[in-house]
Amino acid sequence: RVNEAAKGVLLAYAAGADLDQIAANFNVQRLVLAPANPSTLPPTPAVLEPDDDLRRRVQLAFEGLSTAGPEGAYVFHALGAHPDVLDASATSPAPGVVAVSVLSRVGSGAPAAPLLAAVAAALADENVRPLTDQVNVVAATIVNFTVVASLTLYPGPDSAVVLAEANARLTDYLARSRRLGRDVTRSGVFAALHAEGVQNVALAEPAADVVVTAAQAAFCTARTVNVTGTGE
């Protein structure tokens, strides 16, 4: 318990209310993704920003204090501009020009016009944007792919349990890969599907690594994972 309490004051390990307290020290508040609805039965609690997303914004907080226009400052202010912003990146295609790409939490990640407008307004603030910068807020390019895999299991384990675990691990990997500039690799999919009890994975799709730029994000449009038999 003492060790857990000690970790609770460290940004890398803090979670929940402990992380909220650390964030408050940096003048950063956890975003509300969906407000609570007390009129439902039972009442619907608010959906809050995940710990990992809040932790990242806290790590960027000092970048946000700069008025010189560093990459981290634009990313920090873009991430805090609206609860639907899942990720953002900043590049400079030409001197004095900044392109901020925005990835949405909603759907495939392609942001709607109102979300882009909210980010643009936040970055246009005179305390954020240097006078010499022309800031263009653009939608992230979504690179679609599918996952098609067949699993061979070791004899003994319940195939339904193993398949469910493999799918859960794949879901977690795809969620962590849903970021700008984050490749989805075949080795990553293999590793995710190799749950306890899986002897082999035959991966048909993606046929190659899904490689994306800082302005792109990979999105899985469909997935099919089947058990085809058992092996030694």
Question: Where do the language-model regions lie?
Answer:
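Carbohydrate-recognition loop of C-type lectin domains
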Residues: E63-R182, G231
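N-terminal polar alpha-helical/low-complexity "assembly arms" that mediate subunit docking
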Residues: R1-T67, V161-E232
